[in-house]
Amino acid sequence: MANLEESFPRGGTRKLHKSEKSSQQVVEQDNLFDVSTEEGPIKRKKSQKGPAKTKKLKIEKRKSIKSIKEKFEILSLESLCEGMRILGCVKEVSELELVVSLPNGLQGFVQVTEVCDAYTQKLNEQVAQEEPLEDLLRLPELFSPGMLVRCVVSSLDVTESGKKSVKLSVNPKRVNKVLSADALRPGMLLTGTVSSLEDHGYLVDIGVGGTRAFLSLKKAQEYIRQKNKGAKFKVGQYLTCVVEEVKSNGGVVSLSVEHSEVSSAFATEEQSWNLNNLLPGLLVKAQVQKVTQFGLQLNFLTFFKGLVDFMHLEPKKMGSYSSNQTVKACILCVHPRTRVVRLSLRPIFLHPGRPLTRISYQQLGAVLDDVPVQGFFKNAGAIFRLKDGVLAYARVSHLSDSKKAFNAEAFKPGSTHKCRIIDYSQMDELALLSLRKSIIAAPFLRYHDIKIGTVVKGTVLAIKPFGILVKVGEQIKGLVPSMHLADIMMKNPEKKYSPGDEVKCRVLLCDPEAKKLIMTLKKTLVTSKLSLITCYEGAKPGLQTHGVIIRVKDYGCIVKFYNDVQGLVPKHELSTQHIPDPETVFYTGQVVKVAVLSCEPSKERMLLSFRLLSDSRPKDPGVESSQKKTGAVRIGQLVDVKVLEKTKTGLEVAILPHNTPAFLPTPHLSDHAANGPLLHHWLQTGDTLHRVLCLSQSERHILLCRKPALVSTVEGGQDPKSLSEIQPGMLLIGFVKCIKEYGVFVQFPSGLSGLSPKTIMSDKFVTTPSEHFVEGQTVVAKVTNVDESKQRMLLSLRLSDCSLGDSASTSFLLLCQCLEELQGIRSLMSNQDSVLIQTLADMTPGMVLDAVVHEVLEDGSVVFSSDPVPDLVLRASRYHRAGQEVEPGQKKKVVVLHVDMLKLEVHVSLHQDLVNRKTRKLRKSSRHQGIVQHLEESFAVASLVETGHLVAFSLISHLNDTFHFDSEKLRVGQGVCLTLKTTEPGVTGLILAVEGPASKRTRMPVQRDSETVDDKGEEKEEEEEEEEKEEENLTVKSKKRHSLAIGDKVTGTIKAVKATHVVVTLADGFVGCIHASRILDDVPVGTSPTTTLKAGKKVTARVIGGRDVKTSKFLPISHPRFVLTILELSVRPSELKGSYSALNTHSESPVEKIRQYQAGQTVTCFFKKYNVMKKWLEVDIGPDIRGRIPLLLTSLSFKVLKHPDKKFQVGQAIEATVVDPDVPRAFLCLSLIGPYRLEEGEVAMGRVMKVVPNRGLTVSFPFGKIGKVSMFHLSDSYSEAPLEDFCPQKIVRCYILSTAHRVLALSLRSSRTNRETKNRIEDPEINSIEDVKEGQLLRGYVKCVLPSSVIIGLGPSVLGLAKYSHVSECVPPEKELYNGCLPEGKLVTAKVLRVNPMKNLIELSLLPSDTGRPDVFSPAPEPKQEERSGGAEEGQKRKEKNQKRREEKEEPQKSQRGGRGKRERQESESEQELVNKRPKKSGAAEEDDSGVEVYYREGEDEVGEPKLPPRGKQTKSTEVPRLHLSSGFLWDVGLDSLTPALPLREESSDSEDEQPHQAKKKKGKKERELEKQKAEKELSRIEEALMDPGRQPESADDFDRLVLSSPNSSILWLQYMAFHLQATEIEKARAVAERALKTISFREEQEKLNVWVALLNLENMYGSQESLTKVFERAVQYNEPLKVFLHLADIYTKSEKYKEAGELYNRMLKRFRQEKAVWIKYGAFVLGRSQAGASHRVLQRALECLPAKEHVDVIVKFAQLEFQLGDVERAKAIFENTLSTYPKRTDVWSVYIDMTIKHGSQTAVRDIFERVIHLSLAPKRMKFFFKRYLDYEKQHGTEKDVQAVKAKALEYVEAKSSALED
């Protein structure tokens, strides 16, 4: 190329059209490569000095413009503009963006939000829910490298470095924005994304406004099977589609993604393309107009011209193009401003839908010498040829380091240069080179080139708060975290570093995929000469290296190395000397030298030491022995310990019986912070502590805990062992580990810990966390967030979040626990030899002592002494002097308030009402006024105003309730309201109580005048008596005092017999209850013990306990005398004979009784009910012990599991096995199927959690275990689709194969789960290579296809290999053919050729000669008669599918031929005749004409070069058209399913001319008469049909006629709307609704409302939220608002839009709060969503808002809803309370009876009837109830029951008659 200008020939050209001229001028202005154009302004500036140069400049300019017209410039960043549509190829895929390769070596980026609107909406939903959505695919799952995508340039940004960045979008709404609905034509090739999944296909977003595009399942099957690995399309999936059919002027479009249709789609003139809507990626047939050295100029689609630059010519045909040559081309881009169309002739773009195969180049980054120039293009660049033949391209900007150094003469063809491969352009199939010396010399070109541990040089780019950004290469940036800026932590790094500084770093971590580079500037690490640890495998014991401390813990330091490898330095390895607190010695970020002690690469666990070990280091035998002993103790174990020594911080103890040393810190001695130091003080060496919890252990250290709350948690199994077991919302009990300024760290017994930030630490404002909590404090925490990836969780300690139930109950439990511990301390004190200590141990509050005044102090307090014990100090505060004047030596009577066991002092009082307290009997649960006398940290001592008794009550209502403002704190002398929990002082000397509301506290001390006290006491008694009278109406009428004790025998009469208990009336009017478990000693299984007792029978029973009337809770009795209302009785023969001592176990609490049960124990329980919501059986083991039987533990029968309540009767005795005793909640988890834990060989019921395609099932069990079922264990006979019968939540019967791992191995084979079955095992289990024998025929599933073989799974862990030569006799040449025929999961039959156990290799054969099966590439032959029995159903399904496929194929063909008359019928008949003749002619040869040859014909069809049939008579063009496939190619389809490809409309005229023998014949007179008569008959038939009133409308005209005749009928209008909706004509349906609203008369309010509701439904289903809101607002204006609100709420609920429904109900409750219908509907809505607690609050709110007259109706409605949707027991309670207040509301009784009949037992129904017929009602109403009772017994009872009702009715009539006579 001696003269570069020769490349641009000059000369005359044809005249251009105006449009072409304007186009050329714009190109001319956009020319950014022309050097002369850039120099134009400079020349003009010079020309001002000399006018002689002006003429010369103009001549040069004209020549330049003329030459530019012939130039073919390549794309550059400067030539791109926003809105430009361009074809690209996916280069890289990350989680948040795509990197897309563009033509001419450019690239752009697609953000995750630019895929499509539906995908963006899903992403927003996922962000809002804060958890991943199952149906949302990640970006790498939607796109893969090599995919061709149509893009639009969304923006051209400038990066921080000043370079342009191209932002792209593949959103169809932006790419196809230029298309309109009316521009759509069949055959168009478009791209779109899946927007939703429908029943029969997918809705595809093609971005055309007003168009709904639908892709049927039939058209998607081939794509799903071959390219989607059998998985259904998901939202956001990118598709290249062909428009098959256009309806409603583009409103509805049918699409196809079949490969044959997509690959053959060309843009045609009939599709009406123009320059405005021409899209990249379209294939066109073009004609070469002009050939130049730089490319071609083409004509296509008649009117359009385009350019092909030198990069996109077909390499093999380079130089062979000529004018007028016809070529296939692909449109690359259309410039929106210049209208220049760029095309490509490369073969890779001529097959739409096919991804690019080569997406990278292996030699990226390589430096090459002597690379020859192939060609040079001015202003574009140079083409080089590499040694492997690959072409490479270097832009002009990469040919030299600067413009000045560039010399075009140096790049003549044949010249060689040194260069470096910097990238590979997929779109151009070219390697991209650079000749810049700076790039060639750069050590790193990509992140892949950087090795971990390498020392690199870089330049500081910026200083950020989190670290320093360093530039390492041209496109490589790294981060130096703040911790790694220096060997020490730097506070002001900007003082040492500034942008532009050169630094030397060492690489810590490099992730090329994420483009993440982390480096360090720590001098010790950068200059270290020691070996580096970059992986766990390289960490050998004894290796010494440098690392960085990243965390300092109590148990040691965590040291981090390179590549995120880290290890632990235990506390004992930190130094040769003991370091009690590592945080005071070490700090985060410290560089240390360590030695590796041990490493487990599989567990990624490494132990290190700061004590740089040598082989000669002596070992401590004591340490080894202690380590052996610690191994015997496990975390969570309860042990007994003996105190060895007391330290300042705790107790050194020995764990019995091995005397293993351990440590028990002082805060862990008690849940109460004040009791810990007391226990520490009084525990002595040699004392033994029981039930101590092992909290944590290391090699030298075991930490113990004695906190009762933590011990109970571990015992109850409520302590999660790993973070994966923890879910947000869980309540956990732990202790405060440490307190920081930003929050509190809480640790749990298993060792897990979490952070409670200040914001959620307390309901009060937190300034300093240490004011609210102390280290070691027991707390209850609620999990708010779990991050498993970072092994972190956030906790809330707020009381509002961590409620444990009733605050009064919790407060009382904490008080009992605290006083119990104080009593234990008294026992420790009593063991001392000191008389003073023993005296203090014997003193209890309330004792009255004679004391002598010893001293009166300045503050007014008095110190007393006692004669018997001289050292005893008694102290009375100024308040407790009670205003008395005292002098030393004076004798006084004092009362003990509290004994300080630490200071050895006694707090006393001189108040006379305390010293002389009244002996007045107190009642339990009675409320009293009290005065605070003494305050301790966790409880207070008060005196009752009426009597002077001392009472203790807790100051905290929760473990977290430890902080109170000064205004909230109690003071001595303050008045409080107390509710008594005990009535007699126990061993503590105090009566126990709980405090009432804080609002009832009084500031000043109440009066203590005796008269006032007496008056108030009398008033209090009167108030309590009145309250008791009110409670009698709601409870039992026999609430009387009695003097019975446990063990007493009583005699009574049975009042009523229930299913699970019997009610007994005792002689004195008391009521007792006999539970079903207290009737017989041995209860036969299946019987109901209560049936042995009859109403009216007298029984003798033993008192065993009592039951609270209000709460119905069992009350254990801990002392012999008690006063209760309902007594618990027993009539067991053994207990009636026994003595009182034999019954002392009944005094235990339910929690203690639960502890006595062990897993595996067999118990007898009594069925109570089946909880439908919770899916478990509720049973009673005893009166105070409940049980639950999960549904899956009920039976191994699927029939029973479907209706478990039908198997058992209420009260029936059942024998069950204890699975797990739930101690805190006092119930047992039971099982009816035998095993109480999952063991190998057991059969259990499970529930499918997840179905994994081509893998198997994940199954969950009620034992908390998870198991997996392999594909090979689903059945004894494999099938083609083994997983289609399984779905999540399905119940399956499983056999436990193995429990060796955390995830169980399961089997669903009938031979395993049901040993009694005798079904033949068609596919035996293959568990190892030993189970396989040579010559054996086996079936298996295809796992994958390799380049030379196929891998087949024979068992869960057994694979076989079939070489291509043993797969098929056809031997197709490409791997893709195997992928298509043998997809993953396909069932195949194989013969075992060889078994090599040494190599663990099984060779298989799929050849028909070995297996007897058809070839995998041939259609399946008709099975023999004996083979049909096993697959009859599958064969029938296949036939139905084929028949359906043929019918669907014939439908459009019939529609195309519909109007062609007799000629078409004759053609179809002749064609059918020919098709029918062929099998007769060929006979048996038809079976041979299958498989390979049909397969190769299909392949030839794809290429587009049809060939003659291989054998048989060749058909002429006038004969039957060639057969084609109806829906993709199916290997199992025979020739009978192939249909002829009938000619289209365009071909019909040609075929008609070519077939003269099929022309129309002239009709005779007789034939014309017959046709006329036939037409008249048809016309009369149509008229009769139109007059038929029962005729169904079939068209819009039919509906128009109907609505004209009945304009006010909303039914017709709704049918009209439905007619349009079925045709997806949404706008027409809206128009019909609007017509209806205008047409229907205003008097027909209901008819109009029906249309409004239909319109709301339409907008909810097909419209937007905005359109729905507009319709709703209009409907409210024209109708009764309440009705419209209720209808919309129903619409939201039915469409499962619960959030919108809830918001609407809240609006209704504000606007219509006086309407009971709104409250009832809202209650039904809440209960329907299983929110029982919310429904209770709704009822309370309703009663507050509605008038009193509506209350009963609303309460009854809510009770009905509870029966239907909620808890039956709660519904009964509501009815009972209502009827106790309104006993004569017969309507309520009637509803109660109806509900009980539907949802209750027969016993319950009869009980209600018995109660109602004994009411004193009017005779008319009594007659109604007697009639209902009689009808019920006739239907459900026996003849005896019917007679009994009649007798009762007769008794009632006689009683009434006698009353009238009197």
Swiss-Prot record:
Residues 83-171, 187-258, 281-346, 365-436, 453-522, 542-611, 636-707, 729-798, 846-911, 1047-1120, 1160-1233, 1241-1309, 1335-1407 form the S1 motif domain. Residues 43-56 have a biased composition (Basic residues). Residues 1006-1019, 1423-1437, 1445-1454, 1566-1577 have a biased composition (Basic and acidic residues). The keyword Ubl conjugation applies. It holds the Pfam family Suf. Ubiquitous. One of its GO terms (cellular component) is nucleolus. It comes from the Eukaryota. There is a cross-link at K1424 (Glycyl lysine isopeptide (Lys-Gly) (interchain with G-Cter in SUMO2)). The modification N-acetylalanine is found at A2. HAT repeats lie at residues 1590-1622, 1696-1728, 1766-1798, 1800-1835. Keywords: Acetylation, Isopeptide bond, Nucleus, Phosphoprotein, Repeat, rRNA processing, Ubl conjugation. Residues 1020-1033 have a biased composition (Acidic residues). PANTHER family: PROGRAMMED CELL DEATH PROTEIN 11 PRE-RRNA PROCESSING PROTEIN RRP5, PROTEIN RRP5 HOMOLOG. Essential for the generation of mature 18S rRNA, specifically necessary for cleavages at sites A0, 1 and 2 of the 47S precursor. Directly interacts with U3 snoRNA. Interacts with NF-kappa-B p50/NFKB1 and NF-kappa-B p65/RELA. This is Protein RRP5 homolog. It comes from Mus musculus.
